[in-house]
């Protein structure tokens, strides 16, 4: 879907210097959120996602990955963040997060993300935050290192039809 017709741009951040976490906290009035990342990290690893600064063991995730010659799957429960698609240190990777029903206060929160890197693989992930609170803060960690200078993060809102 084209940006502007369905997606409403909320905020874009392009890093002028490396940092460990990128946060968004000014969004409201949408049904779902889309967070698009294009970047690299200082230590090849999987970025992490947290909501409302919750660092408790309230997150679970699963993934399915493939590289053209093999496939793998895995996951974990009771984690302190949602693990998401792996990024490298030099080849730009892309991750698209779809945060479903983020403001609903009667259901746990789910996120679906897709990730790709030209030198590696494609992966689909699903994550769960076991909390019914509306999401008011999104923290995207670099997975143990830093997001490199030039990495770009764009948050979009989606209105229900």
Q: What does each model-found stretch correspond to?
A:
Residues 1-161:
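Surface-exposed molecular-recognition determinants
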């Amino acid at each position: 879907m084209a940006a502007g017709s369905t997606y409403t741009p909320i905020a874009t951040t392009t890093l002028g210097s490396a940092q460990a976490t990128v946060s968004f906290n000014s969004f409201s009035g949408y049904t779902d959120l889309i967070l698009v990342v294009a970047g690299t990290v200082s230590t090849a690893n999987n970025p992490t996602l947290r909501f409302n600064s919750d660092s408790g063991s309230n997150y679970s995730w699963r993934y399915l990955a493939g590289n053209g010659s093999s496939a793998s799957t895995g996951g974990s429960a009771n984690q302190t963040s949602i693990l998401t698609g792996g990024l490298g240190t030099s080849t730009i990777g892309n991750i698209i997060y779809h945060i479903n029903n983020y403001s609903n206060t009667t259901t746990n929160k789910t996120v679906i993300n897709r990730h790709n890197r030209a030198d590696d693989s494609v992966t689909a992930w699903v994550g769960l935050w076991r909390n019914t609170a509306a999401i008011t803060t999104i923290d995207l960690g670099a997975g143990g290192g830093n997001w490199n200078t030039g990495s770009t993060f764009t948050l979009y809102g989606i209105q229900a039809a």
